[in-house]
Amino acid sequence: MQLAIVAVGHKMPAWIETGFNEYTKRMPPELRIELREVKPETRSSSNNAATVMQREAARIEAVLGSLSKQCRIVALDERGKDWTTVQLAEQLTGWQREGGDVAFLIGGADGLDPALKARAHTLLRISSLTLPHGMVRVLLAEQLYRAWSVTQNHPYHRA
């Protein structure tokens, strides 16, 4: 099973790449995390937020098209469901049992296009705080690793 993180944005600071890579390398080979970066759209007087989100959505759709047809889509959104780490671990176990890959979508500065959110199987809120998009990558990778550690009774998670 592959966990794809499809994120708008590129050229992240080194500390974000280091943090993200730290958690992805800890994942077992049968549950690897792959980052797919999507170029952000530049906002201007002729590009309002809706236009920006639509153009970024087209790029995200192109990435989703390269993943398996049975890929489950989880869109990160401030209005999404709040899951505990244990609930995420339960979801991860269920996804593994069902088979297929999972794509986590991280939008750009304006968020995800409403059509993408409507297409998602799940809307997930990673935090009630406003976070830099690069940091969300690191937090998501860490939480996926932590969820996996819960399923394995690994001592990393000590709640």
Swiss-Prot record:
GO cellular component: cytoplasm
Localisation: Cytoplasm
Catalytic activity: pseudouridine(1915) in 23S rRNA + S-adenosyl-L-methionine = N(3)-methylpseudouridine(1915) in 23S rRNA + S-adenosyl-L-homocysteine + H(+)
Keywords associated with the record: Cytoplasm, Methyltransferase, rRNA processing, S-adenosyl-L-methionine, Transferase
Coiled coil is among the record's keywords: no
Residues binding S-adenosyl-L-methionine, per UniProt: 76, 107, 126-131
One GO MF term attached to the UniProt entry: rRNA (pseudouridine-N3-)-methyltransferase activity
Main location: cytoplasm
Annotated Pfam families: SPOUT_MTase (PF02590)
EC number: 2.1.1.177
Transmembrane intervals: none
Keyword Transferase: yes
Family of the protein in this entry: Belongs to the RNA methyltransferase RlmH family.
Function: Specifically methylates the pseudouridine at position 1915 (m3Psi1915) in 23S rRNA.
Subunit details: Homodimer.
HAMAP family: 23SrRNA_methyltr_H
Protein name: Ribosomal RNA large subunit methyltransferase H
